[in-house]
Amino acid sequence: MSMQDPIADMFTRVRNGQMASKVSVSMPSSKLRVAIAAVLKEEGYVSDFAVSGDVKPVLEVTLKYFEGKKVIESIERVSRPGLRIYKKKDELPKVLGGLGVAIVSTSKGVMTDRAARKAGMGGEIIGYVA
């Protein structure tokens, strides 16, 4: 059975891993998943990530906790295969009034809503993290 929405699967694995207080979660790797993991690391939501394996690459995301509490309060998919959500540069959403981030896929790569606004670019809203 093929996976219908790999990004929703990634978000679910991270959410479930944090609820179960896991140190890290593993998933099949792809360029988009690695780019999303890089944004999460850059914003301080995960400790680290690594790709291993040649034939079937596996992405391992090391989760982050602060004083025993999970760092990611919520992670949700916005644009999905059945309903893509695109926003122009001045329509990009602010998650929790700027406390969270929206992950945006632009023509220059995957970045946060703040970076996209600064670059003057819009794109597909992949998801929200807070």
From Swiss-Prot:
Q: Which family does it belong to?
A: Belongs to the universal ribosomal protein uS8 family.
* Domain of life of the source: Bacteria
Q: Which UniProt keywords apply?
A: Ribonucleoprotein, Ribosomal protein, RNA-binding, rRNA-binding
* Quaternary structure, from the entry: Part of the 30S ribosomal subunit. Contacts proteins S5 and S12.
- Biological role: One of the primary rRNA binding proteins, it binds directly to 16S rRNA central domain where it helps coordinate assembly of the platform of the 30S subunit.
Share an example GO biological-process annotation for this protein.
translation
Q: Which SUPFAM superfamilies match?
A: Ribosomal protein S8
Q: Which Pfam families match?
A: Ribosomal_S8
Please verify whether the record's keywords include Hydrolase.
no
PANTHER family given in the database record: 40S RIBOSOMAL PROTEIN S15A
GO MF assignments:
rRNA binding; structural constituent of ribosome
Q: Does the keyword Cell cycle apply?
A: no
**Gene3D superfamilies named in the record:** 3.30.1370.30, 3.30.1490.10
Q: What is this protein called?
A: Small ribosomal subunit protein uS8
Q: Name one GO cellular component term.
A: ribonucleoprotein complex
